[in-house]
Amino acid sequence: MGDEVQLINRLDKSGQSVLLALPMERAQLQEDDMQLRELTCDPKFRRVLITDARNPNAHALAKSLLEAGASAVFVGEAESWRPYPDRAKLESLQGVELVSLDVTDTSSVQELAGEFGGKVDILINNARFVRPGGIQGRGDVGFAMDEMQVNYFGMMRLAQAFAPAMAGRSADGVNSAVAWVNMLSAYSLVSNPGFGSFSASNAAAHSLSQCLRAEMASSGVRVVNVYCGPTEDEWHQPLPPPKVPASTLARELVKALQAGLEDVYVGDIAKDIRRKFMESPKVLEKEMTSLEAL
């Protein structure tokens, strides 16, 4: 009686805001409290699927999730015969298992869902195809089709194959399915003309993620959208800083899961875009257009 507490604001499984009273001083293993876990998507004790091993952020994501207590991390790998820089680093992580997955191939997605669908508690869709360019600078629609195949249709294939099983496992206790994470570009909210076609594919993915969130709402599985600015990779090299390191992206994602957030903006550019988008989408559009003209 009379002890001071701190109030935290969280979302319940229906997406409604609730207040929870916690001790002023953090208790040992506080994050393991069942009531608190019901209000978060904490990766501790849970099994995670990362969809694209070839994305430069895959190793950082897997490492951060394991450090946060994930019991297993499955990492999807397309065309395993084709080498990529971080394969050895991924294989060296205890708790990581590389699995065959190509998000552009419906059969590949369905086969993995049939084998692992009942084991995935958190799905992180980091599959991405990005190339610079808009409309007139490209001679055909080849890259645009690749961007849509991975960034939009890839998410749809994954959702059609994995979402039903995850929705059916949202009340399985410690190992319940809790979160579906979409890694989106901040340019899903406003087009960057220098990456106009990529922006368009992410805008489509953003809209699809909102549809998925609505469909999953009754199950209690949270759809989390991570909006990120330009990252430190080969395709964003021509852009000026600031850029988001993979380690920062991974850290912010884990924090978002632990806090049970629905939307998180990573990096100064993403946060600036969000602020300006909330103030005036048209002014933000004009600003992006003027930057392209410089």
Q: Model-flagged regions — what are they?
A:
Residues E31-F74:
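Canonical Rossmann dinucleotide-binding motif of NAD(H)/NADP(H)-dependent dehydrogenases/reductases
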Residues L90-T106:
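Rossmann-fold cofactor-recognition segment
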Residues A171-Q210, A214-A217, P230:
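Catalytic loop of short-chain dehydrogenase/reductase
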Residues I50-T51, N125-R128, G173-S185, V224-N225:
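Structural signature of the Rossmann-like NAD(P)-dependent dehydrogenase/reductase core
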Residues S207, C211-I269:
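SDR active-site lid
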Residues A159-Q160:
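A short, exposed helix-loop element centered on a Lys and neighboring polar residues
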Residues Q110, R128-M145, G168-N175, G194-S197:
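Conserved mid-core segment of classical short-chain dehydrogenase/reductases
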